[in-house]
From Swiss-Prot:
Membrane topology: Multi-pass membrane protein
Domain free text: In MsbA the ATP-binding domain (NBD) and the transmembrane domain (TMD) are fused.
Gene3D superfamilies documented for this protein: ABC transporter type 1, transmembrane domain (1.20.1560.10), P-loop containing nucleotide triphosphate hydrolases (3.40.50.300)
Primary location: membrane
Gene coding for it: msbA
Keywords of the record: ATP-binding, Cell inner membrane, Cell membrane, Lipid transport, Membrane, Nucleotide-binding, Translocase, Transmembrane, Transmembrane helix, Transport
EC number annotated for this UniProt entry: 7.5.2.6
Spans through the membrane: 33-53, 75-95, 137-157, 164-184, 262-282, 292-312
Any one GO molecular-function label of the UniProt entry: ABC-type oligopeptide transporter activity
Organism, as annotated: Burkholderia lata (strain ATCC 17760 / DSM 23089 / LMG 22485 / NCIMB 9086 / R18194 / 383)
Quaternary structure note: Homodimer.
Family membership: Belongs to the ABC transporter superfamily. Lipid exporter (TC 3.A.1.106) family.
Protein name, entry field: ATP-dependent lipid A-core flippase
């Protein structure tokens, strides 16, 4: 299935143009404008030296050869060539260094802004975008802007100045012949405009396919166990091959479109050169030009072709850069999640109320949650039960404001959550997700995630989570690296490490989505004991899957189709004989089996 890239958006109402991209980049360039001007000046020196080479040929050929040649011309011309090469080399090095300094500074700032904006976007962003799209934007696509800032700018500035200097010298040598050379320029401009539009469309589609190819790799790596157990290697290989072939097709179409410009440009230049030679021969017969003047003119004309070719070739990377800019600034312009009303919350009592809360994702036929109302007293444990798709996860996601309700209000300590500063609100909550998330860092850093690790507190949290002995047996103890998402730990150890992280935070409100994965009896016992310690004295909302957790809850809310259909203690709901009793009976039979 193809993914739709919603990050890439035109940067103005009519599309993306180089001027639009430059306007967006200007705030990043402005603090470095002095260095940019210096780089442009050094590129101007490089361009001027290009015209100096044919300028030295004319006196050498006219006055340096033969028995009547000038002695001074025989010596000053070679020395001037050496001096010219030295000036050119120093200027070229300086311009490259200065431009790379500027572009890398801007690259760093763009990348930091993109990552910061990603961190502060709402949960809907992460549901909408694939990880591969975001990774490509932050890590890879931003380098296209680097290419534009260096290679493209060098071409546009240095080669444009080179063409101007050479055309000026050509006009000085022979204005009639120069007018013939100038005839090819409109033809080249017409070619560029025709190829430009097609290249931009192909680049946009090529980058979309690249993201989809990355997504296939991401899915295959993340689900390698399923792939292997279900013998899905052939299916994944076919999927990857088909997408790679489509990507190759677009790459070749880009090559065909981009490659037409150079030979057509050279053909037009060859026609102009043939006409110039013909006219120059006629002029020489009438003593209107010299050998040195003719050679200098032809040399200058040939030297013009190379920078012109570079200016034509710059179109392809320029289009790639503009397409990348749409993705980069699409992420930077992504709206940040609301930060709340700014009200502080130093220490919550743990008093929670859902008041006629309705929520829908926009595309569903019915609300995901429909007029949900309940209260949770400080220290009370509420278990959420119900069939899959009943709205349990959505309900707990509203409390830390991953999403805001469509209607109704959620209150903490009698105050709507929207009135609190968002960071202050979330600082009062700990979450243990069903899908355990660990970071490729040490055990201590994972336990104290978001804070500077206090090793004594980390050790206490590990002991409370029944993980201290296992960590002590590891070679590096608290400094043991857990690997990507804790791959070096067992399933039970990963769950207990996530519990230790919640214990370390010591927040008064706990959101717990119990893992459904089965563990061996010993690991299950350790995890259950750790959960009981974690929930002590905390207001707890738990999506319960274990019978033992459900049974010890102070109150159970049973959801179905986004509504609370039953409420009460375990014994009360069993006696009622409704949906909860039915679900309990099924789960009990499964566990007994």
């Amino acid at each position: 299935m193809e993914t739709q890239n919603t990050l890439r958006k035109p940067m103005d109402g009519t599309g993306t143009s180089p001027v639009t991209v430059l306007k967006r980049l200007w705030p990043y360039i402005r603090p470095l404008i002095g260095i940019v001007v210096l780089a442009v000046m050094t590129m101007g020196v490089v361009a001027a030296t290009e015209a100096g080479i044919p300028a030295l040929l004319k006196p050498l050929l006219d006055h340096g050869f033969g028995s009547h040649g000038s002695d001074s011309a025989k010596w000053y011309v070679p020395m001037a060539v050496i001096g010219l090469a030295l000036v050119r080399g120093v200027s070229q090095y300086a311009s490259n260094y200065l431009l790379n300094y500027v572009s890398n500074r801007i690259l760093l700032q763009l990348r930091l802004e993109m990552f910061q904006r990603m961190l502060h976007t709402g949960a809907s962003f992460f549901q909408r975008e694939t990880a591969s799209t975001v990774i490509n934007a932050i890590v890879f696509e931003v380098n296209q802007i680097l290419s534009v800032l260096t290679g493209v700018m060098v071409t546009l500035v240095r080669d444009s100045l080179t063409v101007i200097f050479l055309l000026g010298y050509l006009f000085y040598l022979n204005w009639r012949l120069t007018l013939i050379v100038a005839v090819i320029l409109p033809g080249i401009g017409w070619l560029v405009s025709k190829i430009n539009r097609r290249l931009r469309r192909l680049n946009r589609e090529h980058q979309t396919l690249t993201n989809e190819l990355s997504y296939i790799v991401e899915e295959t790596v993340g689900g390698y166990k399923v792939v292997k157990v279900h013998n899905g290697e052939a299916y994944e290989m076919d999927r990857f091959t088909q997408m790679s072939k489509r990507l190759r097709g677009y790459a070749m179409r880009m090559t065909i479109s981009g490659g037409l410009a150079q030979p057509l440009t050279q053909f037009l230049a060859s026609i102009a050169l043939a006409v110039v030679i013909t006219i120059a021969v006629v002029q020489s017969s009438n003593d209107q030009t010299t050998v040195g003047g003719f050679v200098a003119f032809v040399t200058s004309m040939l030297l013009v072709i190379s920078p012109l070719k570079h200016l034509i070739d710059v179109n392809q990377p320029l289009q790639r850069g503009m397409t990348a800019a749409e993705l980069i600034f699409g992420l930077i312009d992504e709206p940040a999640e609301p930060q709340g009303g700014g009200r502080p919350l130093a220490q919550s009592r743990g008093d929670i109320e859902f008041r006629n809360v309705t929520f829908d994702y926009g595309a569903a036929e019915r609300p995901t949650l429909d007029r949900i109302s309940f209260k949770v007293a400080p220290g009370e444990m509420i278990a959420l039960a119900g069939p899959s798709g009943s709205g349990k996860t959505t309900l707990v996601n509203l409390l830390p404001r991953f999403f805001d309700p469509t209607d109704g209000a959620i209150l903490v300590d009698g105050v709507p959550v929207a009135d609190y500063d968002l960071h202050a609100l979330r600082s009062q909550m700990a979450m243990v997700s069903q899908d355990v998330v660990l970071f490729n860092d040490t055990i201590a850093a994972n336990v104290a995630y978001g804070q500077t690790p206090d090793r004594a507190r980390v050790q206490a949290a590990l002991e409370a989570a029944n993980l201290a002995d296992a960590v002590a047996a590891m070679p590096d103890g608290l400094d043991t690296l857990v690997g990507g998402n804790g791959m070096r730990l067992s399933g039970g150890q990963r769950q207990r490490l996530a519990i230790a992280r919640a214990i370390y935070k010591d927040a008064p409100i706990l959101i717990l989505d119990e893992a459904t994965s089965a563990l061996d009896s010993e690991s299950e016992r350790h995890v259950q004991a750790a959960l009981e310690r974690l929930m002590e004295g905390r207001t707890t909302l738990v999506i319960a899957h274990r019978l033992s957790t459900i049974e010890r809850a102070d109150r159970i809310l049973v959801l179905e189709a986004g509504k609370i259909v039953e409420e009460g203690s375990h014994d009360e709901l069993l006696r009622h004989g409704g949906l909860y009793a039915h679900l309990h009976r099924i789960q009990y039979q499964q566990q007994a089996a």
